[in-house]
Amino acid sequence: FRSMQGSWLTVNYDPWGIGVTYSGYLLLGVSMLWMLVSRGGEFRRLLRHPLLKKGGMFVLLLLCLGSGVHAQKRSLPALARKQADSLARKQVIYNDRVVPFNTLARDFVLKLTGKPSYGGMTPEQVIGGWLLRPEVWQNEPMIYIKNEALRRLLHLETPYACLADLFDGEKYRLQKFWKGKQDHHQKMTSLEKAIVEADEKVGLILMLQNGTLIRPLPEDGSVEPVSDTKIQAELLYNRIPFSKLLFMFNLTVGMLAFFRLLYRGLRRSSALSDSSGRIVALSFSSRLADTFFPFSLYAAFLFQLFGYGLRWYIGGRIPLGNGYETMQFMALCALFLACLFRRRFPFMVPFGFLLSGFALLVSYLGQMNPQITPLMPVLVSPWLSTHVSLIMMSYALFAFMMLNGILALCLRRSARMLMLLSRLLLYPAVFFLGAGIFLGAVWANASWGRYWAWDPKEVWALITFMVYGAAFHARSLRIFRRPLFFHIYMIVAFLTVLMTYFGVNYILGGMHSYANA
């Protein structure tokens, strides 16, 4: 090993400890379930509370959804559109699975340019142009260089470089800027990351030109082609930008609905004059708006479910293997919960739109990999899907409680009723998190031979569990009976969720950091 530190191999044998630990998990799980079903319990009492039986408020009318398309018209040699379209359905081996050629071509263009198409041409036309006339395409500025420092080193005036810009004769210009690290665990600077990213793009072009990128199915039949139905499903999935469309839609509707909710609350407290109230009411309080919001919520849920189901069908596994997929699942959970509680708690609707919209925005803009790839063997486990599903359900509920707290700070008169709602959601949220931690421990024991390793993700999940668990003890800790303190606590407590999910993945690392890979 270059680090000269060697490797540690451990063997664990702990039959008594595992038995006692699993028994504790089981007892705690039974007790959590009993707290939910016990007739005299706090959870059932909250369900019967008169304040939570009151109807809700809000409605709104229109939204505007638009997306800009930037097409560069250039006289570049490329495949004819008809030939390119016929090539899109051809099956190749890519990322260790059989895919339509469209998937490979789309990822190629997306990797180079940051967009799924280029210059008004389809991905197949672009990749065909690189194969047929590389001497022309190597002078086309289509390699996106985001880092300004690297652009200055390369003397680029725009964010896009051509392949020829990265070579000085036969010398590779990026090589002189890169100083390889002796310690591979040492963190790279932003410039070094940009150099590595640009080098990967150059490597992708070179792989295409030397024939190693495109791998057709072998003629000996050792790799079976996939069905036409699955090919058509993947082409449809590549064609529709599910995340982009839905995060724009959800955030737009959610913000309008949230402002409507604030307006209704302020009207009840006579904060707005009657004249202004009449004007706003004319805009927002119509029967059409009353129909529009529920319809939009169900439509958004079905659209997200359709996209998620397509990804499941195409990949042949539950999409919970990386950060992109868990954000997609969290958005689905948020929309599902909003649909579930819409009639009893109408103010959950804007929360569902906002939470799902931000989750989809994070998956769209963040450093999360949208490619569909097979899971590493350790992740191919029935424990994984249940473990991640429960954890993400709990995160969605915690996010609802955080938004509920923000709303309560704006609508002080409704603070007590909103506190009761948050306390009601607290039970399933903490129990989902606890059950997810338990199943994660069982999965870890089956995969690595130990159920707890003090990994950063495990530690922060436990911290989150304990922080939210403290709010159960309102009888002992009387301060939790105060609505204002309770809501502020729920807002601050959500920081532990953010640290558990994003902080561990991108800052602390650990065994769970593959979630963003």
Predicted segments, located by residue:
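Solvent-exposed, non-transmembrane regions of integral membrane proteins
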Residues: 1-283, 287-517
